[in-house]
């Protein structure tokens, strides 16, 4: 069986660990087979991915799920990475989702989407040390999602009534353990005023998407807490956001923990100028970037049954 899952951008401004959006910039694939066995055994291979079960988000998610269900089977999987790792594009989450969706279909486990998210988010422990649900929720459901609770996992799709695409400014680099380090940068305490303003931003983002109001979405794509705390990871961000809005982008935000920047554009935006001036800004920070245009995408799917 071959299963695929799309890349994603989480947070979307003030929606830390709440909002995420699946997009078709990249996709991860997992080839999988299940063989009857007297014990549970999970084997994982793939170019450039850990082959230790507890260090690979895909294999760890599957192992924990089948252990919990007391399923005795030998699962062999090959992870084919299409999503760049460590750049804020939901790479580890997509692999975990593809693997969990695969084993759910192969073994006819009957998991619904909420349960798929819960199982997949466990895989994030292998890559970042914490079971955060936002990226995996986007890769399971597709579209834009809101994580409403984690115990129990509760996810709600957000209706999108605005036609836009993303320009992803993706630094060409490799960052080891980036998500874990980025989480360590977060403040332990937050000033009340900043919390209130962030709540307003989050409300504006959701309302802008649902109502199809680009000005509300522009207002919402801001964050005074998480993006500020992590700003050393993406020094090019503020200037890139500024020139994007000057060229009539809807707005911009850090994609997940960065350093990728997501610029929201539509028919009123000067995409060519945003690309040109954005790349120039990246270069002023000695940062080579590539620009990838992407649209909102669907959830994980089975590409092929063997």
Curated annotation (Swiss-Prot):
GO biological process: threonine biosynthetic process
EC top class, as a word: transferase
First-listed, main subcellular location of the protein, grouped into a coarse class: cytoplasm
Pfam families noted in UniProt: GHMP_kinases_C, GHMP_kinases_N
Lineage top rank: taxon: Archaea
GO cellular component, one term: cytoplasm
EC number: 2.7.1.39
Binding positions (ATP): 84-94
Keyword tags: Amino-acid biosynthesis, ATP-binding, Cytoplasm, Kinase, Nucleotide-binding, Threonine biosynthesis, Transferase
InterPro entries the record matches: GHMP_kinase_C_dom, GHMP_kinase_C_sf, GHMP_kinase_N_dom, GHMP_knse_ATP-bd_CS, Homoserine_kinase, Ribosomal_Su5_D2-typ_SF, Ribsml_uS5_D2-typ_fold_subgr
Reaction(s) catalysed (UniProt annotation): L-homoserine + ATP = O-phospho-L-homoserine + ADP + H(+)
Cell location: Cytoplasm
Entries under PROSITE patterns matching the protein: GHMP_KINASES_ATP
GO function term, MF aspect, one: homoserine kinase activity
Record bears the keyword Glycoprotein: no
Keyword match Cytoplasm: yes
Alphabetized HAMAP family for the sequence: Homoser_kinase (MF_00384)
Recorded family membership: Belongs to the GHMP kinase family. Homoserine kinase subfamily.
Function: Catalyzes the ATP-dependent phosphorylation of L-homoserine to L-homoserine phosphate.
Protein name stated in the entry: Homoserine kinase
Taxonomic lineage of the native organism: Archaea, Thermoproteota, Thermoprotei, Sulfolobales, Sulfolobaceae
